[in-house]
Amino acid sequence: MSSRNSFHAEASKPTRRQIITGAALALGSFGLASTQAFAEAAQEISHAEEAIHQEPVFKASRKRVYEALTDARQFQKVTLLSAAVQSGMAKGNTPAEITAEAGGAFKLFNGFIVGRNLELIPNERIVQAWRVAYWPQGAWSLAKFVLVEQGSDTKLVFDHTGFPKGDAGHLLEGWNGNYWEPLAKFLA
């Protein structure tokens, strides 16, 4: 796996209104009231001045990468290879919970990461309202995964915005050690 990592201070970011409008459009007929986590995310997406941009490349098709990120059984196998589980920080025996539909919730790493899928375009794009358990109540961020075919490989163009200021370094380590590196091992 090769990658390009960065985090940017003062990155351009969507306004709260743009995020809420985009999320509402992405959910279409899925009603905001019926999705508590999404409703909280829409009301309180944080407005940080930092952003993470990464472009890991995986030796797998877009379909395999997409399925590994959206299928609970496959992502559980990725979780078992993660730095969090290997170090004992997270329990590997707690299954990943992922509802693979727009508006569906996910719960990963024993509830340390939770969120809601705002947009799922199979084999192309995943957009999530995403949060870490220790963030202040109502603090949500936006994670966007775009899958780009590169011959027989897949480049994952990843942007993470709206997280609490000061968390970029920790999150960057987490994306590498708990998502990209174990995902590359799983797909190998």
Residue ranges and their predicted role:
Residues 74-112:
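Short beta-edge strand/loop motif at the mouth of beta-sheet-based domains
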Residues 51-53, 111-115, 138-144:
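Short, surface-exposed coil-to-beta transition loops
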Residues 62-63, 118-124, 146-155:
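A short, structured loop/turn motif at beta-sheet edges
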Residues 1-14:
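N-terminal secretory signal peptides
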Residues 13-18, 29-44:
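N-terminal twin-arginine translocation
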Residues 131-177:
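Beta-strand/loop substructures that line and gate deep hydrophobic ligand-binding cavities in soluble
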Residues 46-62:
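Terminal, regulation- and interaction-focused segments at domain boundaries
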Residues 65-66, 75, 106, 117, ...:
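Hydrophobic pocket/interface hotspot
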